[in-house]
Each structure stands twice: as structure tokens, then as C-alpha cells.
Design a protein with these regions (language model features):
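C-terminal "closing" transmembrane helix and its immediate cytosolic amphipathic cap
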Residues: 1-11, 309-361
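Hydrophobic transmembrane alpha-helices
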Residues: 72-79, 175-183, 232-244, 274-286, ...
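Membrane-helix interface linkers and caps
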Residues: 7, 74-91, 95, 114-118, ...
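Functionally critical transmembrane alpha-helices in membrane proteins and complexes, commonly lining
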Residues: 18-78, 96-98, 227, 301-306
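Membrane-interface helix-loop-helix regions
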Residues: 51-57, 95-169, 274-275, 280
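Aromatic-enriched alpha-helical transmembrane segments of multi-pass intramembrane proteins
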Residues: 20-21, 27, 130-271, 304, ...
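Generic alpha-helical transmembrane segments of integral inner-membrane proteins
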Residues: 29, 65, 100, 104-108, ...
């Protein structure tokens, strides 16, 4: 299936923004920080900042940053692709190689080693198959537990980071569906979708007060959280059409975010914080060019860190938040760089060689 001539855009070379690598690494490490409290039994002591009735832990802030930057970069990727098939291939190559390795390693290596049940019972339990299938496909949400794995620990999930990945997939589906209409060619197209998500969130769909889930997210994620993540994603999409980058976007973003905290209005935070994030990301300081050449470990940090932290706690290596973070952060970063170097980047390069005109974000 190809995008019509009205929707297709020229396949130009994208502008290189070196700031996104640092921004996404910061986001991933913020998630590691929050999990360092939750997985050692000190969740109530984790740092929290509040904007009105919106409480924000570093991990949630990191997730917001990931969705904003993803919306910005994936919208640009959509504009450069020749059609839906190419768009799907690009997204598949970015998410599934590392995810597949993680899921199979979790089920067939980590699980049998740390489980408290027999190997036979472990593999016969329907939880094992559910974990493998759900987390490998993502379409119908994720599974969080394996039989006998990490039982009795403050957090019993095998990988509590994966729940956001289906939400990312849903955002891609919405983006492609809207893109096929040609709406994203308009400066107000992404802004319209962003406004819709914010309205769902703002007018009554707060966590715990609305119905549980809609569509594919039924019984998986509370709809208030889904609408919030949709808002962050399409805030990034909307900013593609704003002709401001770097400091020109960063300064108004800082001002709006500051006002949001000062007056306690989450809506201003939804507007200002994405501007701040893209202002940082869409910059090209020379000091970050070296980091860009090394690669982007952020996705690997995000998906590998949680089971790593669980193992560190299980064997008594780190049982309080600060030691956990100081150990898990560099180890997860090393895993992230290794994943990028030997798995994620080769997968993207292989796809580029197959489709020379494609540019993958």
C-alpha cells in the first residue's frame, strides 16, 4: 500500500539533531531512578514533583520525554516513507529486534535460573506462554509475571517497563491512520489530535476515576494514562510543524513549564514541557556529536534495566535505592550500548540496504 501523491513528501535528508541522544538517555536513566526506589521497597520515598493534581515521579517524566521525542521523530519518519508498509517495517526494525532478544532471554534463561518452582512446572504453567506471546506481539498488552520468578520481592514483575510499548504501538497506528488522510500535512493536524487527547485527559479521565481502558487497552492500562501518553506523543507530532528549534523553542518551553508549576495547572505543563524537550533535542551542540557517533543506548537502557535491577535485589547486591541506582545505571547503559551496536543498529542498517531510499528514525 502506498501513500497517495497528496500525502507523500520528498525523501529529503533529515536534519541531524544531536541533542536527542542525550535527552533520551536522560529519560531512560530517570526511569531507572524511580525503579530503584520501587524495586527495593522504598517506593513511597521516591522523589515526586506536583503540578496541581498531577504527581510526577522521575520515571513518569522519563516516559513523557520518550513519548514526546518519539512523536516528533516518528512523524518526520512518516513524512519520508513511501507508504504504510515501509513505515511498519521501520517501526518493526526499531522495536522488535532488541525486544525479541529480551523476551526470549527472560523466558528461557533468566526465568529457569531464578524461579522457585521446578523447571517442568515453570514451562507447563500457562503464565510462561502468556508472557512469551503477549510481550513478543504487544498488540494485546503485556504480561508482567513468570511462575516463581522474583516472588517475595518488593516488585514481583519480571519487566515493569514493557507496559508502555503497546501504548507506543497504538500511537503509531493512530499516526499512520491520520497520516493517510493527509491531515498531518497541515500545520494544525498534529495539534488537533494533541488537543483531543488532552481534552479526554483534562475533563474527567483522571487515574482511578474513569472507565478502565478503551479499544485494545481494555483491562491493560487505565484510559487516563493512555490518553496522557497519547497527548505527550502528539505534542511531539504537533511540534514538527512549529518552525522553532533549539533555544527558540526551549525558552518558551521553560517559561510555560515554570508557570505550570507556579499556578498548579497541568494543562500548561502538557503544553510547555514538550516544547522544552524538543527544544533540547532539536539542537546540535558540538559536544554531543561524539555521543551521536557512539550510538543511542536509551531503548536498551529502558527495556533491560528492570530485570537487571530485579536480579541485583534478588542476590543482595543492591537492596536500597542509592546503591541500586549507582549499580544499575552504568550496567544498563553498557547493555544499552551493546544492544545498539550489535543488534538494533545492524537491524536498521539491514533495512536501509534493502530499501536505499528509506530513512529510519
Amino acid at each position: 500500500m502506498t501513500v497517495s501523491a497528496e500525502i507523500k513528501k520528498p525523501q529529503n535528508t533529515p536534519t541531524r539533531y544531536y541533542g536527542f541522544d542525550a535527552v533520551r538517555i536522560f529519560a531512560a536513566l530517570a526511569v531507572v531512578l524511580t525503579h530503584s526506589f520501587a524495586l527495593t521497597g522504598f517506593e513511597e520515598d521516591r522523589p515526586i514533583i506536583s503540578v496541581g493534581n498531577l504527581n510526577i515521579a522521575p520515571g513518569y517524566l522519563g516516559v513523557c520525554i520518550f513519548f514526546v521525542t518519539s512523536g516528533f521523530l516518528v512523524a518526520q519518519s512518516w513524512g519520508r516513507t513511501s507508504g504504510v508498509r515501509e513505515f511498519v517495517r521501520n517501526r518493526f526494525a526499531r522495536i522488535w529486534p532488541a525486544l525479541t532478544l529480551l523476551i526470549f532471554a527472560s523466558v528461557f534463561i533468566l526465568g529457569p535460573i531464578v524461579t522457585t518452582v521446578s523447571t517442568g512446572e515453570y514451562f507447563r504453567d500457562k503464565m510462561t506462554l502468556e508472557y512469551l506471546v503477549k510481550n513478543s506481539t504487544l498488540i494485546f498488552g503485556t504480561a508482567s509475571k513468570l511462575p516463581g520468578v522474583f516472588v517475595g520481592q518488593p516488585g514481583s514483575s519480571v519487566n515493569g517497563s514493557l507496559w508502555t510499548l503497546p501504548q507506543e504501538i497504538y500511537a503509531y497506528i493512530i499516526l499512520a491512520s491520520v497520516g493517510l488522510t493527509g491531515l498531518l500535512r497541515r500545520w494544525w493536524g498534529g495539534l488537533l489530535i494533541f488537543t483531543g487527547f488532552v481534552c479526554f485527559w483534562r475533563f474527567g479521565f483522571y487515574a482511578g476515576s474513569g472507565p478502565r481502558g478503551i479499544g485494545f487497552s481494555l483491562s491493560i492500562v487505565n484510559v487516563s494514562f493512555s490518553t496522557a501518553l497519547g497527548a505527550w506523543f502528539f505534542a511531539g507530532v504537533a511540534l514538527v510543524k512549529i518552525p522553532l528549534r533549539g533555544i527558540k523553542l526551549f525558552i518558551p518551553g521553560v517559561l510555560l513549564t515554570g508557570v505550570a508549576f507556579a499556578v498548579g495547572e497541568p494543562l500548561l505543563f502538557f503544553i510547555g514541557f514538550p516544547m522544552l524537550v524538543i527544544g533540547c533535542g532539536a539542537s546540535s551542540p558540538k559536544v554531543l556529536r561524539g555521543l551521536h557517533r557512539i550510538g543511542d543506548p536509551s531503548y536498551g537502557i529502558y527495556i533491560y534495566s528492570f530485570p537487571l535491577q530485579q536480579v541485583l535485589f534478588r542476590y543482595g547486591v543492591a537492596t536500597t535505592p542509592v546503591p541500586m541506582f549507582l549499580l544499575a545505571a552504568p550496567l544498563a547503559t553498557l547493555l544499552g550500548f551493546a544492544s545498539w551496536r550489535f543488534l538494533e543498529h545492524p537491524a536498521l542498517i539491514a533495512l536501509k540496504r534493502k530499501k536505499p531510499a528509506a530513512t529510519i528514525s
